[in-house]
Amino acid sequence: MIGRIAGVLLEKNPPHLLVDCNGVGYEVDVPMSTFYNLPSTGERVVLLTQMIVREDAHLLYGFGTAEERSTFRELLKISGIGARMALAVLSGMSVHELAQTVTMQDAARLTRVPGIGKKTAERLLLELKGKIGADLGAMAGAASASDHASDILNALLALGYSEKEALAAVKNVPAGTGVSEGIKLALKALSKG
């Protein structure tokens, strides 16, 4: 599976990207939240990815943050929610807005996302209750542990650690720690664990 992609951004046509990785062009679909934060074409881009293999296609979905990818994966576990619908949800609201919506059980807010009706919204709320909030709570704890938590987390993911291991390690990094020192502290915590 392809879990991360780094290369030169060749094309941007919402929500599709073409990323050149050493001469190989990868087509990647991204949520609009990631799309709006992309660099200009011709510049280097790094995306966390989720590869989906279907009978008729191999599809690659890209995300700017680990929490977006984790939420995408949770959405895919829900019956009747495919990759396109999950991408639409993440394009229609941020991960934190989705977590608030799930916590408040606000089906009306979810129905504003194109393609989601009342029944689908209710199923999403039921299935995500207790899952998405727990993930975000862990990530919020990691983010408060360091000003550079996202960069440290992405570095650990790039080194092959699981999201769970990386989040636990980032929690041990004191606030105000720089990225390189934070990575060292996180790696030290991982080696002890």
From Swiss-Prot:
Keyword set, alphabetical order: Cytoplasm, DNA damage, DNA recombination, DNA repair, DNA-binding
Q: Which residue ranges does the record annotate as region Domain III?
A: 144-193
Cellular compartments annotated: Cytoplasm
What is one term from the GO cellular component aspect held by the record? Holliday junction resolvase complex
Q: Where is this region: Domain I?
A: 1-64
Span list, region Flexible linker: 139-143
Q: Does the keyword DNA-binding apply?
A: yes
Q: What superkingdom does the record give?
A: Bacteria
The record's section on Pfam families has: HHH_5, RuvA_C, RuvA_N
Q: Which GO terms describe its molecular function?
A: ATP binding; four-way junction DNA binding; four-way junction helicase activity
Q: Where is this region: Domain II?
A: 65-139
GO annotation (BP), single: DNA recombination
Q: What does this protein do?
A: The RuvA-RuvB-RuvC complex processes Holliday junction (HJ) DNA during genetic recombination and DNA repair, while the RuvA-RuvB complex plays an important role in the rescue of blocked DNA replication forks via replication fork reversal (RFR). RuvA specifically binds to HJ cruciform DNA, conferring on it an open structure. The RuvB hexamer acts as an ATP-dependent pump, pulling dsDNA into and through the RuvAB complex. HJ branch migration allows RuvC to scan DNA until it finds its consensus sequence, where it cleaves and resolves the cruciform DNA.
Q: Which family does it belong to?
A: Belongs to the RuvA family.
Description of how the protein assembles with itself and partners: Homotetramer. Forms an RuvA(8)-RuvB(12)-Holliday junction (HJ) complex. HJ DNA is sandwiched between 2 RuvA tetramers; dsDNA enters through RuvA and exits via RuvB. An RuvB hexamer assembles on each DNA strand where it exits the tetramer. Each RuvB hexamer is contacted by two RuvA subunits (via domain III) on 2 adjacent RuvB subunits; this complex drives branch migration. In the full resolvosome a probable DNA-RuvA(4)-RuvB(12)-RuvC(2) complex forms which resolves the HJ.
Domain notes from UniProt:
Has three domains with a flexible linker between the domains II and III and assumes an 'L' shape. Domain III is highly mobile and contacts RuvB.
| Protein's UniProt name | Holliday junction branch migration complex subunit RuvA
